[in-house]
Design a protein with these regions (language model features):
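Aromatic- and Gly/Pro-enriched helix-to-coil junctions and flexible linker segments
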Residues: 1-125
Length: 125
């Protein structure tokens, strides 16, 4: 499993798809209605904290988890905008399938998974 994670993490770099990230604030972006609902939900700040705590070690422009060179699938979760852009993936992979974090390396708690599920389900109609 770990070897698969390593291969997936460096694949974007091998393809040459890693781009320099430009800082963009939420006020500069036209969010769709679903993203706006997610942003304005009462749980958003807690979800952001969970993602920063449990996902950033791998899903960063410069991952700091040992052996991860590039964010898996080039999914970077460093800003609120990143979280909104990848909300569905976060929901499916952490709250529904429990595929992330792999082997629960970041010790994501059940209540954190439930909060992510609640945040997404309540605000996506």
């Amino acid at each position: 499993l770990f070897i698969i994670i390593i291969i997936l993490s460096i694949y974007p770099a091998l393809k040459g798809t890693i781009n320099d990230r430009k800082e963009v604030s939420l006020s500069e972006v036209n969010l769709n209605s679903r993203q706006t609902e997610l942003l304005n939900s009462k749980d958003f700040e807690e979800v952001v904290e969970i993602v920063y705590t449990r996902c950033n070690m791998c899903h960063a422009a410069e991952p700091y988890y040992d052996g991860i060179i590039v964010a898996p699938k080039n999914v970077i979760l460093e800003t609120e905008l990143d979280i909104l852009m990848h909300a569905r993936q976060i929901y499916i992979n952490s709250a529904i399938s429990h595929a992330m974090p792999p082997a629960n390396l970041a010790s994501m708690e059940t209540n954190e998974r439930l909060l992510i599920a609640q945040w997404y389900q309540k605000n996506i109609r």
